[in-house]
């Protein structure tokens, strides 16, 4: 067994303080191992896209919740809850719960990405989320989530 210092194996570098290093950075998985600047820049782009998609998902979920609440309130106030409309509405709460679960998993994944403590990675999340927020909420006010 050779334990010499000339090994070509690269190991993930896990820093527990804020940093700007990218050499040997692993993001969430060992297979997402960054060894050079071009890989780092591509990863930042991918992370920004993830931030963007997360905000778009949040907007879509919010829209579907609002549509459901308006539709349910309208039917309830008019007394039009027939057996047919009840059966159509019964799948909606499940779909809303599923959307929420996807959003929750997505937000935790972004949190794990941010836990690299790399300033550029965190900035990429923020930039992507900001673009997604801007694209989704041009004229509306939305509360900001805390897990991203």
From Swiss-Prot:
It comes from the Eukaryota. Residues 55-108 are cytoplasmic. It holds the Pfam family Ctr. Residues 1-33, 130-148 are extracellular. The keyword Glycoprotein does not apply. It is a multi-pass membrane protein. The chain crosses the membrane at residues 34-54, 109-129. It is found in: Vacuole membrane. GO terms for molecular function: copper ion transmembrane transporter activity. Belongs to the copper transporter (Ctr) (TC 1.A.56) family. SLC31A subfamily. Mobilizes stored copper from the vacuole to the cytoplasm under conditions of copper limitation. Homotrimer. This is Copper transport protein ctr6.
């Amino acid at each position: 067994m050779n334990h010499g210092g000339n090994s070509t194996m690269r190991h993930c570098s896990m820093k527990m303080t804020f940093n700007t290093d990218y050499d040997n950075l692993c993001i969430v998985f060992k297979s997402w191992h960054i060894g050079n600047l071009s890989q780092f820049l591509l990863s930042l782009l991918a992370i920004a896209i993830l931030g963007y998609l997360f905000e778009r998902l949040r907007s879509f979920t919010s829209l579907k919740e609002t549509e459901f609440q308006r539709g349910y309130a309208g039917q309830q106030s008019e007394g039009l809850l027939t057996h047919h409309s009840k059966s159509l509405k019964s799948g909606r709460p499940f779909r809303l719960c599923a959307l929420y679960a996807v959003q929750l998993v997505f937000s935790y994944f972004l949190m794990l990405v941010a836990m690299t403590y790399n300033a550029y990675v965190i900035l990429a999340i923020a930039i992507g989320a900001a673009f997604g927020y801007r694209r989704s909420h041009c004229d509306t006010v939305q509360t900001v989530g805390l897990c991203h």
